[in-house]
Amino acid sequence: DYETVEACLRVAETGHLTFSTLHTNSAAESISRIIDIFPSQYQSQIRIMLSMSLEGVLTQALLPRADGKGRVLAMEILIPNPAIRNLIRENKIHQIYSAMQMGQEKFGMQTFNQSLADLYFRGLITQEADHAGDGDECHVLP
C-alpha cells in the first residue's frame, strides 16, 4: 500500500538498508510497480527518491532442473549505475532492460534471459523450463 511504500522510501533515503518483496517478472516491472502505487502528482518526486536510494533489484524464479532433482534459481540482477538512475529519474523505465544488457560485464548486471541462457548452456534447465519462467519476454533458447 501507498503508506508502507512511502515509509520504506523515506527510511532508505536516510541510509538504512531496506528490503521489500514484490510479485513482478523483472527489475523494470518492480520499479514501475513502486512508482505506480503513488498518485500521478507524486510520481516525479518518487522517481527522484527511488533513483537516489535504490541499491539493487533481484528478480528470481525457481525452475525445474534438467535432471529432475529439484529446482535451480534463475535471476535478474539490476545494480543502479548512473545510467540506470537517470532512466528512473526521467521516467524511461522501458529502457532499463537495454541498459542492463550493456552493463552486464562492467557492473555485474544480468537480465533474466541471460540467466536462462547460462543455465541452459550449463545443462541445468531444459527448453521447457525456459518457457515456463515468465511469459513476457522473448527467450533466447532454441
Describe each PLM feature range.
Residues D1-P142:
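Short, flexible helix-loop junctions that flank or precede catalytic/ligand sites
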